[in-house]
Amino acid sequence: MLNEIFKNAKSHMDKSIESLRRDFSTLRSGKVSVNILDNVRVDYYGTPTPLNQVGSVIAQDATTIIITPWEKPLIKDIEKSIQEANIGVNPNSDSECVKLFFPPMTQEQRKEIAKNARSMGEKAKVAIRNIRQDANNAIKKLEKDKSITEDENKKALEEIQRYTDEFVKKCDEMLKHKEEEVMKV
């Protein structure tokens, strides 16, 4: 029964870390990443569709992304979706593709992105702590139901705390790395 609680808690904490990793990938850093477009949806025959499913999206260099739609009539819809996504860039297009030219980030923009990263990191840590609380409640319920002894309860709570400390430390390390990446000129 305890092993199930441990496994469940660790699995949910892993998912929180993965979610944070995905969130960080959408933040712009020194060089442009195609992941900044992950949340852009294009109206494809009436269905909001991820941009990478209607064309190829590649980073040409540190400041340029090129989107080549598989169907040329989608170029206008792609432009519109990018403008609505408000990612700080205006699309340029020709008959073949859409080009996004990202200007170098100002210090103020870097600070704002770092602030967003800290907010995302804090949300992940709160999620991990909530998972710990749920696991602790389940363990205490087992002791109350006399399924485990007081000593087993104490050891189990310590184990959950070790998991929590480990995953919070991962969040902090990821945040530190992302802040360094964003602030690097």
Curated annotation (Swiss-Prot):
Keyword Zinc applies: no
Gene Ontology terms for molecular function: ribosomal large subunit binding
SUPFAM superfamilies membership: Ribosome recycling factor, RRF (SSF55194)
Pfam family, one: RRF
Gene Ontology biological process terms from the UniProt entry: cytoplasmic translational termination
Family membership noted in the UniProt record: Belongs to the RRF family.
Full protein name: Ribosome-recycling factor
Organism: Helicobacter hepaticus (strain ATCC 51449 / 3B1)
Encoding gene, per UniProt annotation: frr
